[in-house]
């Protein structure tokens, strides 16, 4: 007799959420992920433990982590933007080696830090092409929460890339989110998703992954490998890590009400301008069925 689960296999999320055999059980889950993160170190902040509990993770960086404006770079950065980008690249390779991710599974899409939304069409095409080649079971990325304009761009890239694949009749991976940071009650909140009443999904759909002592040590070592980012990374705790299915976002509306975290930092991008660019891109995408 054929098992009902063979005819209707559980979704990747249901497999991850299974309390006995899922990602919180400590057993490695036979699902292949691609992580799309905005900058080198984002993958360690949000999903270092997840990477170790899944099969053959591939990590894709949306940008090189090097802003054009020297004032937006790490105090430890010296020299040209290209030199800083190389430093960020080398730190990522060293950090991910600690998680067993080999260099052929570490990819850069070529965006510039702080400017991903301006390159959104090209970045989405590149990522869709990668997904078609790799055919992962899941993609893990940032949530749309106004923490960093490049984080929000990563969420948009994943959403559009899946639609590109669907138009071409190709398989689309399930999309999950990890935590990063956002503004709440006047403070930067890390390690949590935006509350449900802000339209960001249900807390009942979240998985809180408690890291083992060994995983905590490895995460600390990975964070330490990002020598240039130590001032920023000091605000992040070691665990737990959280995952949830990505909601269907309206990228033309503000993620949370009020001011966004990156707006409070007086960066060049504003939420209003980001959404204006996103709306124009999405309108063009809808008008061009061949995209």
Task: Please state what every model-predicted region is.
Residues 65, 111, 144:
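Flexible loop residues that form catalytic
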Residues 22, 26-83:
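ATP-dependent adenylation/pyrophosphate-handling site
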Residues 1-34, 79, 103, 116-291:
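Metal-dependent de-N-acetylase/amidase catalytic core
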Residues 65-67, 114, 183:
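Active-site loop signature of alpha/beta-hydrolase-fold enzymes
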Residues 62, 98-111:
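A conserved beta-strand->alpha-helix junction
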């Amino acid at each position: 007799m054929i098992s009902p689960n063979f005819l209707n296999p559980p979704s990747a999320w249901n497999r991850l959420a299974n309390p006995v055999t899922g990602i919180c059980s400590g057993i490695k889950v036979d699902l292949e992920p691609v992580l799309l993160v905005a900058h080198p170190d984002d993958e360690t902040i949000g999903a270092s433990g997840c990477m170790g509990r899944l099969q053959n993770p591939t990590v894709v960086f949306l940008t090189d982590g090097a802003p054009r404006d020297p004032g937006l770079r790490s105090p430890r950065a010296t020299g040209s933007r290209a030199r800083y980008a190389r430093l960020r690249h080398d730190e990522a390779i060293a950090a991910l080696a600690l998680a067993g991710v080999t260099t052929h599974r570490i990819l850069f899409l070529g965006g510039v830090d702080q400017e991903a939304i301006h390159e959104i069409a090209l970045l989405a095409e590149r990522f869709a092409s990668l997904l078609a080649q790799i055919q992962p079971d899941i993609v893990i990325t940032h949530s749309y929460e106004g923490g960093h304009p490049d984080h929000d761009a990563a969420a948009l890239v994943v959403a559009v890339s899946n639609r590109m694949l669907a138009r071409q009749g190709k398989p689309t991976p399930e999309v999950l989110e990890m935590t990063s940071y956002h503004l709440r009650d006047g403070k930067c909140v890390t390690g949590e998703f935006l509350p449900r009443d802000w339209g960001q999904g249900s807390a009942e759909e979240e998985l809180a992954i408690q890291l083992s002592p060994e995983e905590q040590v490895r995460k600390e070592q990975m964070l330490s490998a990002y020598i240039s980012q130590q001032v920023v990374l000091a605000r992040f705790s070691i665990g737990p890590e959280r995952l949830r299915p990505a909601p269907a976002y309206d990228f033309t509306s503000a993620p949370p009400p009020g001011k966004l975290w990156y707006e409070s930092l007086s960066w060049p991008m504003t939420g209003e301008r980001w959404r204006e660019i996103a709306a124009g891109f999405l309108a063009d995408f809808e008008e061009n069925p061949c995209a």
